[in-house]
Structures are given as structure tokens and as C-alpha cells.
Amino acid sequence: MLDWNFIAGLIATVAFDIIYFGAIIGTITVIILDNRNPVKTMAWILVLMFLPVVGLVFYFFFGRSQRRVRVIGKKSYNRLLKKPMAEYLAQDSCALPANYGRLISLFRNTNQAFPFDGNRVEVYTRGLSMIQSLLRELQKATRHIHMEFYIFEDDAVGRMVRDVLMEKAKQGVEVRVIYDDVGCWHVPNRFYEQMREAGVEVRSFLKVRFPLFTSKVNYRNHRKIVVIDGRVGFVGGMNLAERYMRGFSWGIWRDTHLLLEGKVVHGLQTAFLLDWYFVDRTLITSARYFPKVDVCGTSLAQIVTAEPIGPWKEIMQGLVMAITGPRKYFYIQPLYFLPTEAVLVAMQTAALAGVDVRLMLPYRADNRLTHLGSCSYLAEALRAGVKVYFYKKGFLHSKLMVSDDELSTVGSTNVDFRSFEHNFEVNAFIYDTETALQMREIFLQDQRECVQVFSKNWEKRPWHRKAAESIVRLLAPLL
């Protein structure tokens, strides 16, 4: 006599296996056909093979490529670029630095990033001085304030900034604010509602209603941009939160941020207005947001953005070119060091060619997993002659790079797959000896608070530490 229960169970099991393995094989096929970085492809395949259920869920939420998605139509994009392009064409012929003309052209061709001369640059390395300057400039606003931050906290600093924005909105100043929905998950809605009630236009970037059930959580706006009246701008690594001023019980919070004055602010304005279109579907192109600006200084600068929705990885490509260009030195301090193969090979090549390449990382990081992954790359860098330092005075959150007393960049971009592949980022690239010398001195001052890592000693770290680093490195493209 047939056991129908057994047969039904067998059919259900076979059907489940077919669907289960079909989903895994289908997902692996999609990953392979996507023609992405082989390292990232293998990382996803390993996750799917050894952690199939978790791997399927993670790939659905975090792994799908968005590079074919278009945020804004070409016609609208050209309309938005019309004013800064006119300003660029109207300026006297820029004398491009001989050593970085190709880098400037790269950013123009891939990012529509116009180089503007006649700018003034002010550098901040502590949160207090940056916030004080920001509050002063906000108080001077008479026409508009445009602001976007990854984190806009409901704390003493956030409330000070909020109150100024509300006051300005009541005075008739146009105020627009973008905050990242994931970066501000824990901030109560009432904090933003108070601004809206005062007339501030507030939008969240890629709102995530159910964080664990949407791939939007993977694509975050990590930019920190402020534009005031189209004349003054801020960009860098600092968010609006008290900890950027206060630091921790065990040390200071060390970061780098810029105040910019001059035509280069048009680049920040364009970046913000593109993001505003993304969150509000309102295209703002009026010339009053791009006022005629007098010469404020001597710096030549570009504002370069990167996002997960275009064909190019603009800032990563620029970083590779910036590393291989110097003849004397290249200093860099990122929060994380999970480099793509192109970036790592560029650093090794420069060091082997005799360039003084220095890498500075935080001794204590905010993410242990990412810190382990960062450490897994250091042996290869050290072997090629890269000098590695761990900053011990506090928490190093800075994203600064300087080379040959000619080029420097500050922004939101880390040296990791997330910044290069998934985040919306922005950096100011400055071609100016005075600024580069200042950045170099900042780096060297930080170096005095560091412990240097030597290859021979680094190889002696415990085997279990090496094993942990190696395991995390397998997942580096996914972090």
C-alpha cells in the first residue's frame, strides 16, 4: 500500500530543493553575467556557497548593482550644468598645473567637474572651529541656505544649527536640508518637523521604512555639503553632531573640513541641486543660485562627486591617477583602508618607484570588522615600501590626501569599496601650493601623534589575529 504522506513529503522536499538550488544557481549566474569586479564576484559566490540562505538575503538587499540606473535625464542634467558651465567658459583661461592637467581632464570628462580659479580655502581640523565658522556664515545668509549631511543629530550642536536655520527661514531666506535616512535612523522625527513648521524644506535621502527589508539601505548619501547664497561653501568629513567637538574620554576627534569661497562653490551648488532633484523631483536651475562671484583667492579647485548610479567610479579613478602622478611624496589619511586592487597596486607602484608614500590610519576605529579588514592589506603595502602609521591621540576620521606640494583633496570619501561602489560622496580637489603645504603640515603634525608600523614587527602579530584579518578580507568588497 502506498504511503501518500511519504510521497507528498518527498515531492515537497524535491520541489523545495529545486527552488532553493535554482535560486542560488540563478543568483550566481546573475552575478557572473553582471561583469563586475572579479574579486567582488568571487566574494558573493563564496557567501552564497557557504552561507546560502544568508547569502541570498544579503545579495537581494546589498548586492544588486545600480550603475545602470539614471537619476536625472540628460536634458535636465544639461540645464542644471548650464550656469556653472557658462561661468567656467567666461573665466579667463585657467593656467592648469602641468603635473595635474590630465587629472583635471579626467574629472571634467567623467564628472562634468569644472576647474575654477580665484578661490579661497580655509582648513579646519577640529569640530569646534568648523561649527563656529559654519554658524557665523549661516547668520550672514540673505538669500538661500542649502545643506546636506549624512548625520544631523538632535544634540547640542544639531540644535544650534537647527535654530539658526529656523530663524533664517522665518526671515524669508530659502532653506533646504537633506539628511541621510540611515545616518539619522535614531533621530526623532520631531527634530525635523520643527524645522518644517518654521518654513525649512527638509527631505530625507532614500527613505528606508523597513531597514532590514530593502536594498535602499545599501546606497547612502555620505556627503557633507553646505552652500550659503551661492558664495560660500563647506565640504569635508565632519557631520553635525556633538561628538565631533567633544571627542571621547580616550582622545580627541580629529577630522578635516574646508570652507570655500569663490566660483568653485558653484560645483557644490550643482552637487546639492542634483541631490535635491533626487529627493524632491524638483529641478532648480535659476541663475540666482549661481551668482557672479568675485576673485576671492588664488586656489584652483574642482568639486568631484561619485555615486553608485553612473558608469564611472570618478573619485576612485582620480585617486589612482593622483597616486601615480607624484614624483616626491604622496600622503593619505582615510578612516578605512579596504582598497580596490587598482588603488593598492598604484600605491605599491609609486612606493617602489621611489615616491615617499605614507598611509595614516586610526589606531582605534569605530568598526572593528572594517578595521580588521583594513589591517589585512598593510603587509602588502609595507612590503612595497609604503610607510604606515597608526594615529593614537584620538579618533582619526579625516579623509585627507596631499602630494608634491601641489595637490590636495578633502571630502567624504574613504578608501574602501563602500565609498567607491555604494555611497554618494563628494571631494574638493585643490591645485594650489599654499593649500598643499598647509595640508602637508597638518599630516606631519598628526604623524607626531602616531606609532609607525614596520614590516618585520607587523609580521609578528598573533596567528589568530592574522586569521581573523584574512577571513574579514574575503568579505572586504561587501563591507
Give the ranges of each region predicted by the language model.
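Exposed, interaction-prone extracellular/peripheral surfaces
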Residues: L260, G318-M321, V345-Q348, L352-D356, ...
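Active-site donor-binding acidic/aromatic loop of nucleotide-activated sugar
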Residues: V388-K392
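Catalytic-core elements of nucleic-acid end-processing and repair enzymes
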Residues: K399
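Histidine/acidic-residue-rich catalytic or RNA/ligand-binding cores of hydrolases
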Residues: E341-L344, H371-G373, S403
